[in-house]
Amino acid sequence: MNILIFGPPGSGKSTQARRITERYGLTYIASGDIIRAEIKARTPLGIEMERYLSRGDLIPDTIVNTLIISKLRRVRENFIMDGYPRTPEQVITLENYLYDHGIKLDVAIDIYITKEESVRRISGRRICSKCGAVYHVEFNPPKVPGKCDICGGELIQRPDDRPEIVEKRYDIYSKNMEPIIKFYQKQGIYVRIDGHGSIDEVWERIRPLLDYIYNQENRR
């Protein structure tokens, strides 16, 4: 089973993608994780990507395509791809690769939330500057404001989590996804999921669909 999952900033797509990975035994390919690993390693590519993200801009397609296709070559089948493709150019690159290697996508899941909800979820996020633990001022606050429960490190807001940057990211995402959504609708594999509510509530909107696809494939 090969899945695409996407959604605006704060939609919870990565949380749901990890649940899907565990339930169906898929390989998790997350563009965000791959990009953050490059940034953390302070590679020349990572430093360049960090500049784009700090401004709320999308990373150029040529860079993202190179990173994702390199990962996909090592996986081939039974994957869930999180956060890719996000532009028409990325769709073309992915579709060409899948066609050349005889790989079929089963479903493209779009977890939708409003811009207001996106800002509320993302701008309240805080990261420990020492250990990387994640908190939220509303949903998961630390015991001591501004301090990590685990190591006592200072909690910071990532530059791309500021409200004005989140709004810009949401607008860019929505604009770029319009043709992508239309493409996968024409392919007959697009499914929009309401991303509002708890993690479990959203999961129960996704699970029956994937159980059906998984069972159908196993009957072949």
Swiss-Prot record:
E.C. designation(s): 2.7.4.3
Gene3D superfamilies from the UniProt entry: P-loop containing nucleotide triphosphate hydrolases (3.40.50.300)
Catalytic activity: AMP + ATP = 2 ADP
Entry binding sites for Zn(2+): 128, 131, 148, 151
Annotated positions binding ATP: 10-15, 125, 134-135, 197
Keyword Nucleotide-binding: yes
Cellular localization per UniProt: Cytoplasm
Keywords: ATP-binding, Cytoplasm, Kinase, Metal-binding, Nucleotide biosynthesis, Nucleotide-binding, Transferase, Zinc
Known pathway: Purine metabolism; AMP biosynthesis via salvage pathway; AMP from ADP: step 1/1
Annotated region (NMP), positions in chain: 30-59
Subunit details: Monomer.
Name of this chain's protein: Adenylate kinase
Organism the protein comes from: Pyrococcus abyssi (strain GE5 / Orsay)
